[in-house]
Amino acid sequence: MKKSDFHYDLPEELIAQAPLAERAASRLLVVPPTPAAFSDRQVRDLPELLQPGDLLIFNDTRVIPARLFGQKASGGRVEILIERLLGGQQARAQIGASKSPKAGSVIALDAGGQAEVLGRDGEFYLLRFDIPAPLEHWLLDAGRLPLPPYIRREPGLDDRERYQTVFAREVGAVAAPTAGLHFDEALLARLRERGVEFGHVTLHVGAGTFQPVRVDALDKHVMHTEWLNVGAALVEQVRRTRARGGRVIAVGTTVVRSLESAWRKTDDAPHGELQSFAGETQIFILPGYRIRSVDAMVTNFHLPESTLLMMVSAFAGCDRIFAAYAHAIAQRYRFFSYGDAMLLWSREWGIGNGES
């Protein structure tokens, strides 16, 4: 399977550059699990599309203002994108500069203080910050929000709120779990009234999510790593949902990535079952991989040739996904992080119950 198999042409004007005034006003393309016709709805219609006893699972990671600017001792300008906070005033980061900084060099930060380059960690750099407050708190004032590169404007004050889900609580992401951006408090209240339950995982979306696939042969692609936590309470929620015949719906590809990373085969469950897990994942989901943990997902429209497009193609089938994308383009849906969404049902009904 090749990267080029996942190419599609997207008119540039369909790339959303800003969010709508209301989160839940985004359009929602409903893609049924059979060749039935697509349905054009809005995200605010979800209470009508889900059933009492269903379980929506959100990613509760919180985006940090992870972009910094500074200057090397030589005078050269530097851009820093923090990929992960490591504790002890240290971080792993991407650095953009005319020449790669060497271990031991110091970057004077525009916001005050400095960062020492400790060395390399693969494609990233390890930095130690000399600043007047804990790094996590200092970034709230000093850092800039790292909007995706296809949003061709500087981040504004509104982005501090809108590029964050209303349920974000665990600090550590450098990009938003964008499917969750469509949910506001009013919609969550209506879903609760409908009898839909909520669960949460944490996956800290890393800077690797912005990196393109650089090889055409997908078996040569090295997937980036991200930290996640699937807790025992969520595992029990999923078990209860299955027992009562409810459906499990992931809000975003990061939730699917988390659940599939925590899916384990056991003697009692030869097809696998969800187990609690906290740690790193490097899982790469593409057609041929069978997603068993969820029945449906709410997800945005993804970039051509991206690993996220490959994941949703594994879930719903390549032909179905590309037909849905063609429909969305023809109907002028808005694409990517601030764009519209899909409600995507699995092509294999019942797989979440561990059926073979």
UniProtKB/Swiss-Prot annotation:
It holds the Pfam family Queuosine_synth. Pathway: tRNA modification; tRNA-queuosine biosynthesis. It comes from the Bacteria. InterPro entries: QueA, QueA_dom1, QueA_dom2, QueA_sf. It catalyses: 7-aminomethyl-7-carbaguanosine(34) in tRNA + S-adenosyl-L-methionine = epoxyqueuosine(34) in tRNA + adenine + L-methionine + 2 H(+). Its EC number is 2.4.99.17. It is found in: Cytoplasm. It is an enzyme of class 2 (transferase). One of its GO terms (cellular component) is cytoplasm. GO terms for molecular function: S-adenosylmethionine:tRNA ribosyltransferase-isomerase activity. One of its GO terms (biological process) is tRNA wobble guanine modification. Gene3D superfamilies: QueA-like (3.40.1780.10). Its main location: cytoplasm. The keyword Coiled coil does not apply. Keywords: Cytoplasm, Queuosine biosynthesis, S-adenosyl-L-methionine, Transferase. The keyword Transferase applies. Transfers and isomerizes the ribose moiety from AdoMet to the 7-aminomethyl group of 7-deazaguanine (preQ1-tRNA) to give epoxyqueuosine (oQ-tRNA). Belongs to the QueA family. Monomer. This is S-adenosylmethionine:tRNA ribosyltransferase-isomerase. It comes from Xanthomonas campestris pv. campestris (strain ATCC 33913 / DSM 3586 / NCPPB 528 / LMG 568 / P 25). The lineage of its organism: Bacteria, Pseudomonadati, Pseudomonadota, Gammaproteobacteria, Lysobacterales.
